[in-house]
């Protein structure tokens, strides 16, 4: 992240204020303040991640993935023979924190801040699937979108989606 000295000074002052306003996270803000003040290039890359951008199209895709899992779970609940499909297969896992952190951050924002999909179980890892999921979800979405009744899926349709 390239910043002028003036921008670094402004951000440093913001971190200093946050240290006073949020004592529980003061150590984190002091660390970031030091990084910005001294311009440590390697650590400045952390700010790129914090101030990253998620395009509107990507946000819509993440919401679509979450909506697909909502539809899968609702459909699974309505099945007469739901035992044939393990509930864990229709439960949203989230995204990999190591490789898909921007998507994971958006999911957490949608659930914890926006109050959407609050019925999803974050598990002990807070929607960290611990394995890359983006490509899998893309295949699943393709199958789900081809289903005529996306919220009234049959057992066979659910199987096709989760096995995509």
Curated annotation (Swiss-Prot):
It holds the Pfam family YfbU. Disulfide bonds: none annotated. InterPro entries: UPF0304_YfbU (IPR005587), YfbU_alpha-helical_sf (IPR023146), YfbU_helix-hairpin_sf (IPR023145). Belongs to the UPF0304 family. HAMAP family: UPF0304. This is UPF0304 protein Ent638_2838.
